């Protein structure tokens, strides 16, 4: 837990975490690592339709059979510990907004990611749009508790898919000067957003610093699809950061037990974290192992369940043993409206992430309906709660350089 946190904040986190802290469970953590090593060695990870990834893993000692590569977990840990930074600086257009991510730093909070639907302040329900997206970015900028404006806060359903990465980039750069997350629609989109963001930040590349953090998901069980693999490679080679995550549904895409989910998720993220270091030693990474019980009767995850919080505490400790920053989830819920269920479930998940020492907390505001909806009302309430941990107001963003804005608009028009 960072020493910079206020005394009362540390006391609250200690109170929440006291019953769960796994630091003393050395035998349990070693058992998870050994079991994940066995999964990697005997079952392997499936890397779909990406010969480059399979070739580089074979050169690193992996044994490939078709698109399945069996790996040495201990060697993957050595690669990660040797090269991956324990802390890095995520830069914004405004240097005053730069945020450290990792060891000793307070958690970074970012809003919901990927919601197709929106509930407006008046209760009306709409599909996401370009206009609404800009309003959500502006709300994230104005919220002192949110130190990152995220990515794909809602889906721009009124914009063609090939234009969305640049439209979202323009919204993040013009409506805020905080750091934000990168785009993974395709390797080409990721690289375009990286290059244009670097031009907007207008500071030379520096060791231990980057401009964007990208969400790279494994697909449980034990699979990586081609687009995340190719994006991971492009991002690492550019020196930008990746948040390599396994997001499991316990009993559906992972074992139903906490221990089983941790073993599978750890095996999946070890492969992705090591790949980033193989492509570019020192590439910034964040590790995420997240698992939620899956209700087979309703065919829906149960967000807020205590089992997921136990997964978070052990995942955080596994990340610290690797020496990398750790991801947590924010105020996520299965509730359909912003009610007592929403507050109770979201509060439990967010508290577990904070108390576990998570470095980057995604979905920190706005989440409803298993993530299918972003609510303006809940967005504001979650952000207001987070603001109590920091400063009360945010100044307006610095103006975006006109040449950068013109270049982005020109590319959008060509698309």
Feature roles, as predicted:
Residues 1-28, 88-113:
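N-terminal basic/disordered segments at the start of proteins
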Residues 2-11, 22-35, 43-58, 377-415:
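Catalytic-core signal marking the mid-to-C-terminal active-site face
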Residues 17-21, 298-303, 331-338, 366-378:
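Short beta-alpha connecting loops at secondary-structure transitions
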Residues 51, 55-120:
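Glycine-rich, N-terminal phosphate-binding loop and its surrounding beta-alpha-beta segment
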Residues 102-104, 108-112, 132, 141, ...:
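Short juxta-domain linker segments that transition from a proline/glycine-rich
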Residues 124-355, 359:
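Helix-rich catalytic cores of soluble enzyme domains
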Residues 359-367:
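Short acidic/histidine-rich active-site segments
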């Amino acid at each position: 837990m960072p020493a910079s946190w206020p005394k009362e904040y540390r006391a609250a986190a200690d109170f929440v975490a006291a019953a769960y802290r796994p630091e003393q469970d050395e035998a349990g953590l070693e058992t998870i690592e050994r079991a994940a090593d066995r999964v990697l060695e005997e079952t392997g990870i499936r890397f779909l339709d990406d010969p480059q990834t399979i070739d580089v893993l074979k050169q690193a000692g992996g044994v490939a059979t078709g698109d399945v590569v069996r790996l040495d977990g201990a060697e993957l840990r050595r690669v990660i510990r040797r090269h991956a930074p324990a802390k890095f600086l995520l830069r914004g257009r405004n240097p005053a907004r730069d945020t450290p991510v990792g060891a000793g730093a307070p958690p970074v909070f970012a809003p919901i990611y990927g919601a197709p639907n929106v509930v407006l302040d008046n209760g009306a329900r709409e599909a996401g749009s370009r206009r609404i997206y800009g309003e959500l970015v502006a709300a994230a900028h104005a919220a002192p508790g949110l130190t990152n404006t995220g990515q794909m806060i809602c889906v721009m359903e009124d914009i063609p898919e090939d234009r969305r990465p640049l439209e979202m980039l323009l919204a993040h750069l013009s409506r805020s000067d905080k750091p934000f997350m990168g785009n993974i629609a395709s390797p080409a989109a990721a690289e375009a957003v990286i290059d244009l963001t670097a031009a907007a930040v207008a500071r030379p590349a520096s060791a231990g610093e980057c401009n964007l953090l990208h969400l790279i998901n494994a697909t449980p069980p034990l699979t990586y699809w081609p687009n995340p693999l190719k994006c991971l490679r492009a991002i690492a080679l550019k020196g930008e950061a990746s948040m390599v995550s396994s997001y499991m549904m316990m009993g559906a895409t992972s074992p139903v037990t906490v221990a089983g989910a941790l073993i599978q998720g750890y095996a999946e993220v070890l492969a992705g974290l090591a790949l980033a270091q193989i492509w570019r030693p020192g590439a910034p990474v964040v590790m995420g192992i997240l698992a939620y019980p899956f209700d087979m009767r309703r065919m829906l995850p149960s967000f807020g369940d205590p089992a997921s919080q136990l997964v978070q505490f052990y995942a955080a400790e596994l990340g610290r043993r690797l020496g990398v920053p750790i991801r947590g989830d924010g105020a996520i819920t299965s509730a359909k409206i912003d009610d007592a269920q929403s507050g109770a479930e979201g509060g439990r998940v967010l508290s577990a992430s904070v108390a576990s020492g998570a470095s980057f907390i995604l979905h920190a505001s706005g989440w409803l309906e298993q993530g299918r909806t972003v609510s303006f009302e809940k967005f504001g309430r979650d952000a207001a709660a987070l603001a109590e941990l920091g400063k009360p107001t945010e100044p307006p963003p610095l103006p975006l350089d006109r040449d950068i804005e013109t270049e982005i608009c020109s590319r959008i028009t060509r698309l």
